[in-house]
Amino acid sequence: MDLRKRDKRSVAEEKAVTGVGMRYVNVPMTGLRPPTEAEITKILTLLEDDLAGPVFVHCRRGADRTGTVIAAYRVHHDHWENRRALREAMSNGMNFIQLPRQHYIRTFRPASIHLEAAPKPSSP
């Protein structure tokens, strides 16, 4: 799952990923703000898809957008306390100036997210 905006790198990545039989998903998020409700709903829906198998989530640095998404997943799926999820994100490199993302993780409530049915995989 690529959290970067679509560009030449993501097109090349998609080709490489699908070329080895895996599924590529792009959910572009800005690096400047926490995810929207629509973005986090789509992301958690994809991460909760039992048929998807292991999922590799990344952004540019793999710390701020990725850290926020994985923290929300930890709270939602693993039933972690928000503080624990934030500590993990910070220990894995979330930038200390990412105050809006930190606030998002501290206040994220899984009950406010209504997951959709997982999308059917497309053929590579």
Model regions: which residues?
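Cys-dependent protein tyrosine phosphatase-like superfamily
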Residues: 1-56, 68-124
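Short cysteine clusters
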Residues: 59
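Substrate/cofactor-recognition hotspot
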Residues: 62
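Glycine/aspartate-rich loop-and-adjacent alpha/beta segment that forms the canonical ThDP
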Residues: 65
